Curated annotation (Swiss-Prot):
Name of this chain's protein: Nucleoside diphosphate kinase
UniProt source species: Rickettsia bellii (strain OSU 85-389)
Pfam families per record: NDK
Gene Ontology molecular functions: ATP binding; metal ion binding; nucleoside diphosphate kinase activity
Keywords linked to the UniProt accession: ATP-binding, Cytoplasm, Kinase, Magnesium, Metal-binding, Nucleotide metabolism, Nucleotide-binding, Phosphoprotein, Transferase
Lineage: Bacteria, Pseudomonadati, Pseudomonadota, Alphaproteobacteria, Rickettsiales
Length: 140
């Protein structure tokens, strides 16, 4: 087990329903420390760049439209095996298939409006953190 950093984004559906605190509680109860957090509304350009790996997929346009539909909360999380731990507490992408007690099962509304995004690998975590945060914004 190693200490890692990972990226998390609380999505517009959760923000609209005032679930930021609830999501943060799930993360912190799993032993993840929030070392950076900020709220913003992504531009279309930012969303397209962030989700560039999905550009050829049929859901790309609706994903960009959804993620820019309202504010998001961007986070850097730190903890032992943080990437795997965050993926576990988030639950399956589709809330209908997620385990009880996970963020997506308990808060998510649909496969798109599933309340949270999290890095799926070390490379993704590094890229996603660097995309949104300066080193000076990450407070240990």
């Amino acid at each position: 087990m190693t200490i890692q950093y990972t990226f998390s984004m609380i999505k517009p559906d959760a923000i609209k329903r005032n679930k930021i605190g609830q999501v943060n509680t799930y993360l912190e109860n799993e032993g993840l420390k929030i070392v950076a957090q900020k709220m913003t509304t992504l531009t279309k350009y930012e969303a397209e760049c962030f989700y560039d790996e999905h550009r050829a997929r049929p859901f790309f346009d609706s994903l960009v439209e959804y993620i820019t539909s309202g504010p998001v909360v961007l986070q850097v999380l730190k903890g032992m095996d943080a990437i795997t731990l965050n993926r576990k507490v988030m639950g399956a992408t589709n809330p209908a298939e997620a385990e009880a007690g996970t963020i997506r099962k308990d808060i998510g509304e649909s496969i798109e409006a599933n309340s949270i995004h999290g890095s799926d690998s070390e490379n993704s975590a590094k890229r996603e953190i660097k995309f949104f945060f300066k080193k000076s914004e990450i407070i240990e």
